[in-house]
Amino acid sequence: FLAKKLAKHLAKKQAES
C-alpha cells in the first residue's frame, strides 16, 4: 500500500509549510 509513502509525503509538505 502507498499509505506510508503518502503519509511521509504529507508530513514533509506540512513540515515545509
UniProtKB/Swiss-Prot annotation:
One of its GO terms (molecular function) is toxin activity. Expressed by the venom gland. The keyword Acetylation does not apply. Keywords: Secreted, Toxin. Signal peptide: none annotated. It is found in: Secreted. One of its GO terms (cellular component) is extracellular region. It comes from the Eukaryota. Belongs to the cationic peptide 04 (cupiennin) family. 05 subfamily. This is Short cationic peptide-5a. It comes from Cupiennius salei (American wandering spider).
